[in-house]
Amino acid sequence: MSNETRAKIVKAAPNRWLVFCILTLSGGIAFKLSSMKDMFYVPMQQFMGLSNTQIGGALSAYGIVQTIGLIAGIYICDMFSKKYMIGGSLIGLGAVGVYLSTFPGYWGFLAAFGVMAILGEVTYWPVLLKAIRLLGDEKTQGRMFGFLEMGRGIVDVII
């Protein structure tokens, strides 16, 4: 993308700080579901009737799908509209959260973690980074990414 095109995009978004705040908030919330095991491992294990091996298998599936999918995610984020990709990913992650609240069995849990990897790591994360990159020009991109991580950290503390 040329510097002129990027400058037009930056100038065309007078509400870019509002967009930035919404993206930061969504970036802090989007990965909470996949990291629920950090705080609720034992209750999750008891209520869902899962063994350590089964939870480890689901987390391994998440990692494998994430690793392979990130390569595809680089290309996917350029093919479709960012607002539809981010919105669709967040809605999909919410639907997976609702499904997990029904305490599915192992195969449902495994599928949910695979879908979360696709929605969170393949279709959401690269698009979020590209959207943040497009909000700033060459001089402010580093600052925008710093503010993104700061905002995600604040959201993590609050939630």
Predicted regions and their residues:
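C-terminal ends and interior cores of transmembrane alpha-helices
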Residues: 91-105
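Extracytoplasmic
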Residues: 18-44, 48-52, 159
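Residue-level signature of mid-helix packing/kink "hotspots" within the transmembrane helices
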Residues: 35, 63-71, 157
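Glycine-rich segments within core transmembrane alpha-helices of 12-TM secondary carriers
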Residues: 142-159
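Hydrophobic core of transmembrane alpha-helices in multi-pass small-molecule transporters
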Residues: 107-123
